[in-house]
């Protein structure tokens, strides 16, 4: 029915609501392409680090002001001291002048005693007794009864650094041994013996005690056990010997007359010994025994267990739990400098420098003492973050500000900081300083090759970034002084110190880097064979992968590594002649490389591959990087085929399951990046899709592939990557789905 304007008003008013009205303007939809969508602004993860860095700068500024005030106060005090010294000196000069003006006796006549020169009344000086003094005075504090019995034998203890206790005990036995000596004096003498000598001379002490009819007390046995525990590690034979001594202690009744019960000190020594042996099960048994006997765990026990978790078993989670327990117990159990040092090292080793810096702030708030190990650990952790890279050297220079003498370990990590930063000139100078000081180690050798691999030599101006140490004036002065004083000329007096550096402070071309690294490796094979291990060979390969040609890398790859086929079932493989010919042409070096040391070729030929290291996942990852850099698909295919054989070997199969999964994921990620660099995006995507539910893929591993696909306009790849990452967040990270959230809201009712 049509309702026109002529219809009655009442009828129109009655029927009008029945018919809805529509807006004649249609809605407009705007479609945005996937690659044009505005990304959500990422939350800045560096805010906390920036805030901490600002607070740290303010703290250092306050410390500088305090130092200036302290220096001003010292200057005023020095001024007063100098004024006092001048007044005293003037008084002395006046007194000396008066003495000079006195007349001599010859001027006053013989037999007359000049007035004022009479001898003052004082005690008579005792005559010198040569028998009471001796040049053979013992430098070791010994009881008087022991010294009297030793007599002239104390000449073997003249210096604290040079003591011959074996001869001293022989002389003591000839003079009557321990007969008639108090047991307290005997214990004091045993405590005075250095631990590195006590472990050898303790059988003589036991013999002397037996001759005197005295029993070996538990305190002496505990001291002997301490001497046996010198060093960072203990092998099974040493543990068995210590357990034999503890078994003797169990046979003697304790204070309560019970057999089998040990003292708290013995239990603590046992825990420390098992920790150095990395035997966590035995440590737990001893701790459980202490609890059953009602012995409360002391801070020493917690410290030993924490140290074992950090340095031996690398169990970071357990270390954190122990540290938190000590903080919860507080009082005498509260963590001190040693415990903070261990937990900071653990956090740094697990790439959590942020938490390590929080603990550093706790130490500042609690006014705890610091040491070099803490400063070195914090410097090492800061170098792993781009935002804190310049802060790393601040912690190193704090060692000098505190007046500490840098240890060899500190110098090694200064070399590491320079290597990580790509400062090859400083790294070579620091390595030479360690070399001249006879403080080289396999770790320092690996750090030097890290410097060669990460060097800024050959980089463009756009890629170059200033060294972290040059940001500080103190750092610039330190670097300049080191480079000016270093002498890189090989010495002929000591072959071990004749490191074959090129005669220049800074290397300028990749060819120079390759040549020098080759010569340094040849020198190590000749005089420091123990330096050539898996870590150093891996970094040696990385130098060629980053700086050299593919032929340079393959030469080192084949010469220094091999595939360990132990446990692999041999299978017969047929290869087409055409493929074999093309592969051999691509992989075989055509002629000797000018960047390879001739001596290295002679050394490797003479030692007949005795230095070769078995290949592992890291070796294959470096090989993939070399193949990707030179766009060589055939070599990359050879690498991942051989890695499949390596997975069947006993060396890989014997690894823990979690470690195998981690290594497989690293290699899969390396394959994706390698294929991405070769512009084979479909192949890279195929690997990603086939392992989607096997590994936890994140943007960290897929950002390179995503950027390459977006640049090429390959929407299929970008869409698939977003889907894989989204599903990984749900499957591995516990992220709730949208439909599950809707269902949850509906069931909850709000």
From Swiss-Prot:
A Pfam family annotated for this chain is PPR
Q: Which GO terms describe its molecular function?
A: mRNA binding
Keywords for this protein: Mitochondrion, mRNA processing, mRNA splicing, Repeat, Transit peptide
Q: What is its main location?
A: mitochondrion
Q: The organism sits in which domain of life?
A: Eukaryota
Might you name a Gene Ontology BP term for this protein? mRNA processing
Here the transit peptide covers 1-82
The UniProt record lists the keyword Nucleotide-binding:
no
Q: Which GO terms describe its cellular component?
A: mitochondrion
Compartment list: Mitochondrion
Map the PPR repeats onto residue numbers.
263-297, 298-333, 336-370, 371-406
Which PROSITE patterns does the record cross-reference, listed alphabetically?
Answer: PPR
| Function recorded in the entry | Regulates mitochondrial small subunit maturation by controlling 15S rRNA 5'-end processing. Localizes to the 5' precursor of the 15S rRNA in a position that is subsequently occupied by mS47 in the mature yeast mtSSU. Uses structure and sequence-specific RNA recognition, binding to a single-stranded region of the precursor and specifically recognizing bases -6 to -1. The exchange of Ccm1 for mS47 is coupled to the irreversible removal of precursor rRNA that is accompanied by conformational changes of the mitoribosomal proteins uS5m and mS26.
The similarity comment for this entry is: Belongs to the CCM1 family.
Give the quaternary structure: Binds to mitochondrial small subunit 15S rRNA.
Record's miscellaneous remark: Involved in mitochondrial-nuclear incompatibility, a major determinant in reproductive isolation between species, through hybrid incompatibility of Ccm1 and its interacting partner 15S rRNA between yeast species.
Protein name, per record? Mitochondrial 15S rRNA processing factor CCM1
Q: Which organism is it from?
A: Clavispora lusitaniae (strain ATCC 42720) (Yeast)
| Originating gene | CCM1
